Amino acid sequence: MAIFRSTLVLLLILFCLTTFELHVHAAEDSQVGEGVVKIDCGGRCKGRCSKSSRPNLCLRACNSCCYRCNCVPPGTAGNHHLCPCYASITTRGGRLKCP
């Protein structure tokens, strides 16, 4: 009976420790990016590319930049200084990628 009780106590302690570890890791994972609000890239890029002569190309580049930077400058052109990450992304050829 004593062996059964000892085994049961050890299993209970092991279960509690495992559960605690899972909760700690879940709490750490939920804090990653805490305070960062994701913007609506589709809506922002639709407005940004509304006057583009090549809207599909503009939307593809804008969405790519938005997902990477979580920022799209206001207006249909310019204003890159308001979103430094967006303004710093370039193509392999060295040209600005983001519209």
From Swiss-Prot:
Post-translational modification: Six disulfide bonds may be present.
Gene Ontology cellular component annotations, sorted alphabetically: extracellular region
One example of a Gene Ontology biological process annotation: gibberellic acid mediated signaling pathway
Keywords, sorted A to Z: Disulfide bond, Gibberellin signaling pathway, Secreted, Signal
Leader sequence residues: 1-26
Keyword Amino-acid biosynthesis: no
Pfam families: GASA
InterPro entries, per database record: GASA (IPR003854)
Location of the protein in the cell: Secreted
Tissue expression as described in the entry: Expressed in siliques, dry seeds and vasculature of roots and rosette leaves.
Main location: secreted
Reported function: Gibberellin-regulated protein that may function in hormonal controlled steps of development such as seed germination, flowering and seed maturation.
Family: Belongs to the GASA family.
Full protein name: Gibberellin-regulated protein 3
Gene: GASA3
